[in-house]
Amino acid sequence: MSDVEERINQIIQVLREQVVQDTAVPRNIRRAAEQAIEALMNKEKEPAVRAADAIAILEEISEDPNMPLHTRTIIWEVLGALEQIK
């Protein structure tokens, strides 16, 4: 497994464990995180394209006023990691 694929898998794990499975996070935000995970898992596209798709989804929800602060921080960290994927 390449370094990029390993990084993508780590990002998927963070989203799954800290956002999707957190019941304190509103449902629409968990759903967007699931969509970002699906975009990252799409092996038909290049890693950079998958990362860009996930960034678009996560940026859209990152300013949601209903998002808990700890979740917003996680989303920002994930966005930073995704932006490094080329």
Swiss-Prot record:
InterPro entries: Ta0600-like_sf, UPF0147
Gene3D superfamilies (alphabetical): Ta0600-like
Classification via Pfam families: UPF0147
Domain of life: Archaea
Family: Belongs to the UPF0147 family.
Protein name in the entry: UPF0147 protein PYRAB16980
Organism, scientific name: Pyrococcus abyssi (strain GE5 / Orsay)
